[in-house]
């Protein structure tokens, strides 16, 4: 994956890796080509022949190809796709990124409110925000340094509880930003944390949820990759862990979990965005997260795990590794997915598709959802692809943060109410 963007004022917690020169995406275009039976093979050939990056690769007919085209290839690309339908996602990707990354300044000690969600923020400001937010609700929450990334950055978490007290109820675990470029997931998981804390004893549904569950929110599962997207490469996906005897760093952390690790839903190529790692669970951050989940499970168990991603507007259930196998709890997973999608749509009209991961988006090996369900024995394990469906993709404008948070919270509240009701 190519690199992008420098934010001169970004503070980085720890710097142990070599500085990578930022790349300017000015003039790059992101173009969607819908595929069908008569053009999917040709679209695949064009991507290969021109050595183009993709945000979405069309593995079969009917899937969209979201293609990043550099200025030097635009003429050749447009000639090759002549006669095909296309949609322009970003006319100038560099301009879109500059608009997205106009971070609002944050002063530590500020009383967090809705204004935080009007902008994206630096990694260091996220740490300050989470500590400030927790500081307003000290009697029923804690800020946790859950462990360190490969480069030594803090993996932050908020732990929230209700009337029963700390560690007295089955846990809910939310993960965000396991894929570094999916910035909207950082903001949406923080929006839910803010809502669970600030609306407790004000909103009956939220109060019931917080009283019935021990809530753990990890907004930045992959801090090294996240920081890297803000200094060098806006479209970076993996962590930043070096790979022995390979020029390409990083593991796809959501292909590194030690369950059904090998298969067509991951790659053995260190330069692939879906590189599974050298061994199951060898990602530094995965070791941290597995240790945390096991520790949480040892209290009252884990009632639900949700791994938040973008983009695609999907809410999905196990399995990722197989398109034919189904867990015994499949019917319940499907029911809760529909409840989530219906309640979410009622807020802003945003449609979500639901279904098993492998059948709904693509096959995935070594993913968090399958691992949580089958190894940790989490009762309900789910994943989401947040806004949008491709109009802006990974570079989602900041004015969509609040509506994304509002609708995702509504879907989550409806789903958890259904879990409480049994």
From Swiss-Prot:
Its cofactor is Zn(2+). InterPro entries: M14A-like_propep (IPR036990), M14A_act_pep (IPR003146), Peptidase_M14 (IPR000834). Pfam families: Peptidase_M14, Propep_M14. One of its GO terms (cellular component) is extracellular region. Binds 1 zinc ion per subunit. Its main location: secreted. Belongs to the peptidase M14 family. This is Probable metallocarboxypeptidase A. It comes from Trichophyton verrucosum (strain HKI 0517). The gene is MCPA.
